Each structure stands twice: as C-alpha cells, then as structure tokens.
Amino acid sequence: MAVVKVAAIQAKPVGNDLTHPGNVKHALELLRKCVQMDDEVRVACFPEYFPWSGREELAREAEEFGIYVIAGIAERENGALYNSCILFGPDGSILGRQRKLSLGSMERKYFGFTPGRELRVFDTEFGRIGIGVCADLWGPPNVGRQLLMLGAELIFNPSFFFVLRDVWHCLLLARAVELMVPIVAVDTAEFPFRLGDRVFRECGGLTCIVGPPWRDMEEFASWWHGARFNWFLGWLGTEEGILIRELDLDRAREFRKAWFSRIVGRENPWVAEEAARG
C-alpha cells in the first residue's frame, strides 16, 4: 500500500532575509527537528527559495536521515540564475530539480532569475512526485494538468507569498478538486519582507496539506450526493512550524479514477485528449 508520511516545514528566514547564509544551518536544524518529531517521515519539503543555498549540506542530511528532501535553491548554470526546487534522495543523491516556469516581476527584476523550460516528475518507491513551484501550480491551470499527465500522484507546492496570501487556499482547493491529487503546499513563516523601498508585513504563513478527504468509496459517494468534508488535511498559522501528515496514495488513485469517470466518463480526460492529438 502506497502510504507516505510527509512534512511541510514552514521556515522563517534568518534575519528576515531569503538569501542569508545562516538559512542553511537553520534548514538543517529544522530537518533534525522534523525527524525527531516523527521518524517515519519520508519526504520533507521546505518553502520556495529556502534555504537558497546549501546543496551539499542538504544532501548529507538527507542521507543521514534516509529521507527525501525538497529544498528551494538558487542555481546558476551557464550564466543564468534559476529558481529551483531540488529533490534529494534518501541516499543523498540529487534525483532531479524543478525550475520555476512562471516568474513574477520581483523575481526577474530583483533576483535576476531566468524561467525554467520543462516540467518533470520523479519516481519514488511510494509513487511519482510532481513539484509545482509557487504560481506554477496555483496560477496557470495547465501545469497541474501536465503533472497529472506525467503521472504525478503527489504534488508539492513550495511557495513564497508576500502578496495574494489570502487567496492561496482557495486556489489550492480548486487544484486539488480538479486533479484529485494530494497537494503539500509550503510557505515561509511570516516575516517582514523588504523589497527595495517597500516592506511587506503580511508575508508568509498558512502552509497546508489539501487533498481527497474520504476514508473509503462510501464516503466519496456521500460527498457526491451532497455530504460535506474538509479537504484541508492540516494547516499552520503564521509562526514557524512543521506540519506532518500521512497520505494514502493508493486511496487517492481510487478516488481520482471514480471522479473522472463520473464527470467525463473516462479515467483521465487530459491524457485522453493528448493521445487524440497524436
């Protein structure tokens, strides 16, 4: 059975600075705390941009604890700077990276990031992981669909919200229902974010895990006929913290099949559309 425990680490940047060198040490401390809280955690995810650097240190820590780690790293390649989320394997290797596709004006102007070019999914022993970096997932609807077409069974959404924070949960809920895939959405803790001469104070927080809430197909059927269920499987406030939940990907797959079969008459409409295009 594909059951996996995931941890969403809502980290506060050292000195209220996303690029602070001390973020690496803080990330390692939070990883250790995460494993101490629950040694059955298999995937730990940090927010977008966090800890900004520290690939070697994170790889060593992932290997020491034998877990998957997703971390926000600013990567330079061939003269270009990318907003990357790197997936470290439990053996300390880099299994892959997802570079953000949809860059806002802040990222282009202040950080000088270059957009990524492709979406990927990553195989693990419990299922395929997809990563939609911040607006890539909750903004353009095609990204979530493409991840599903690539076989994603669990989607992580490392994010950094210094605007639009209050609508994030609405957008995540829409994606979770549309795709019928569990989403682990991770923001920084709240801190005053300085951007040029401006300071954004309602910045960060509200990390959550959202996904199919039913325990069995009987509950799914009751929801279909009007029963109410809370899709938010857990959430944090604005302080630094760690959210841990167990997700059953086999059960989610069963619900997904039933959902698409009922609303469009086939298991995955986007896969069918892509096949029809040839």
Show which residues each predicted segment covers.
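Conserved beta-strand and immediately adjacent loop positions that scaffold enzyme active sites
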Residues: 5, 70, 84, 118, ...
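Active-site-proximal beta-strand elements of phosphoester/diester hydrolases
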Residues: 3-20, 45, 128-136, 156
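Cys-nucleophile CN-hydrolase/nitrilase-fold catalytic domain and related Cys-dependent amidase chemistry
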Residues: 14, 18-99, 161-181
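Active-site catalytic loop in hydrolytic enzyme cores
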Residues: 76-153, 159-174, 203, 224-231, ...
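C-terminal beta-strand edge segments of enzyme domains
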Residues: 121, 189-278
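Active-site metal-binding loops of divalent metal-dependent hydrolases
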Residues: 11, 49, 136-137, 160-161, ...
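Conserved hydrophobic/aromatic beta-strand scaffold that supports enzyme active sites
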Residues: 8, 87, 97, 119-121, ...
